[in-house]
A protein has these predicted regions:
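Conserved acyl-donor/pantetheine-binding loop and adjacent beta-alpha core of acyl/acetyltransferases
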Residues: 78-113
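A short beta-loop-alpha structural element at the N-terminal edge
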Residues: 2-17, 22-29
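A short helix-loop-beta-strand connector motif used in the catalytic cores of GNAT acetyltransferases and
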Residues: 48-63, 79-84, 110
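Conserved acetyl-CoA-binding loop-helix of GNAT-fold acetyltransferases
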Residues: 116, 122-139, 158-162
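C-terminal "cap" of GNAT-fold acetyltransferases
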Residues: 93-94, 143-146, 150-157, 162-163, ...
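Conserved GNAT-fold acetyl-CoA-binding loop/helix
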Residues: 24-49, 60, 84
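Conserved GNAT acetyl-CoA-binding A-motif
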Residues: 107-109, 121, 130, 137-148
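Conserved beta-strand in the GNAT
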Residues: 63, 69-78, 110, 115
């Protein structure tokens, strides 16, 4: 497996990966901003391809390839510490638990999205992507990596636990349009040492 930086040509696949990793939240956000006649995936793809101010901009992604084929990707960022003040009254109710957990992760490197394409799952590639994400976190100067996972996503939860991640906090998932998930959102973290 080889890793490389994301390019504008990856935007279509990255939009699918981001939505899969985000369990439909990205698609819902994109639906709010798509203009008439534009699909929400088209909006999301264009945002990843061209919005260099956005966290999900293609250059912020690491792409995993096997035999020159994209098999998965991830991106993350260092969470500001102190965390910026947020007026929760201006946020959608369903989004608040995610923001609260991100605030708890202040100072860590937050793995915002990670996913392996379906045809490559079950072969250990997620562990390799996770290890590379930990390298990126260390390179950012932090000693802790964090991530959010829905408890209903048992496969991901088992992967993170088996790789040394532990629960730090949890919040109840508030359903949003497009959502079919229930349960809690779990903030997990791992100390990376020196």
């Amino acid at each position: 497996m080889k890793f490389r930086g994301g390019t504008a040509d990856d935007a279509t696949t990255l939009a699918l990966i981001l939505d899969a990793a985000g369990r439909r939240i990205p698609a819902y956000f994109w639906s709010l901003y798509a203009v008439e006649g534009q699909s929400f995936f088209e909006f999301g793809r264009e945002n990843i391809r061209t919005n260099d101010d956005g966290k999900s901009f293609h250059k912020n992604w690491k792409i995993a390839e096997l035999d020159n084929k994209l098999l998965g990707a991830f991106f993350g960022f260092r969470v500001a510490n102190p965390y910026p003040e947020i007026n929760y009254n201006e946020e959608p109710e369903w989004w608040i638990p995610f923001l609260e957990l991100e605030e708890i992760a202040a100072g860590s490197w937050l793995l915002q999205a990670i996913s392996v394409l379906p045809e490559y799952r079950g072969q250990g590639h997620a562990n390799a992507l996770l290890a590379r994400a930990e390298e990126e976190a260390k390179a950012s100067g932090t000693k802790k990596i964090s991530l959010q996972v829905e408890e209903i996503n048992q496969i991901a939860l088992k992967t993170y636990t088996s790789n040394g991640y532990a629960e730090l906090a949890r919040r109840e998932l508030i359903p949003f349009p497009f959502s079919q998930d229930t349960g809690d959102i779990i903030l997990m973290s791992k100390n990376l040492g020196a």
